[in-house]
Amino acid sequence: MADPARAAKLAQRIKVVVAEALGRKVKDPRLEGVTVTDARVTNDLQHATVYYTVFGDETAHADAAKGLEKAKGVLRQEVGRNITVRLTPTLEFVADQIPVVASNLEELLREARKRDAEVAALAATAKHAGEADPYKSDAPEDVDIDEDDFDEEDIDLAGDDDIDEDANKDADSSK
């Protein structure tokens, strides 16, 4: 097992070598619109997966896949010359799905912006369901209510006859 950092460096180097070889060595017209986007190498450095995109329609994608399979031997030979490992890894070419996913995300974002604009338009013309200040007091505004303005007749704690102090004294003396 190789170090993951070494595998990542090797994958990066394979990506560059394959991209350069597609531009210089391979003269297949089916591979003109091919762009190498990424490469991954297994930890044992025996297999490399090269991801690519193709500019064009579905027939261009199918032609590019056939062209890459046909050029696999030449590309592997070029990779073997330009990297320093004991065994040259086998190459596998996989069409990259990032452009498809990106276009789907752009469509979803476009739809979200459209819905946000609709909600903003509704919010601009909307009115509150109740009054502007739902916590408004029912008391007239010219009356000043002060909590310290209670009279002694309103609350008479001094003359409270409900408290039986003698019962408390009897309970303490029985102990």
Swiss-Prot record:
Belongs to the RbfA family. Pfam families: RBFA. The keyword ATP-binding does not apply. This is Ribosome-binding factor A. Its main location: cytoplasm. One of several proteins that assist in the late maturation steps of the functional core of the 30S ribosomal subunit. Associates with free 30S ribosomal subunits (but not with 30S subunits that are part of 70S ribosomes or polysomes). Required for efficient processing of 16S rRNA. May interact with the 5'-terminal helix region of 16S rRNA. Residues 140-165 have a biased composition (Acidic residues). It is found in: Cytoplasm. One of its GO terms (molecular function) is ribosomal small subunit binding. InterPro entries: KH_dom-like_a/b, RbfA, RbfA_dom_sf, Ribosome-bd_factorA_CS. GO terms for cellular component: cytosol. The keyword Chloroplast does not apply. Residues 128-139, 166-175 have a biased composition (Basic and acidic residues). Residues 125-175 are annotated as: Disordered. Monomer. Binds 30S ribosomal subunits, but not 50S ribosomal subunits or 70S ribosomes. GO terms for biological process: maturation of SSU-rRNA. Keywords: Cytoplasm, Ribosome biogenesis. It comes from the Bacteria.
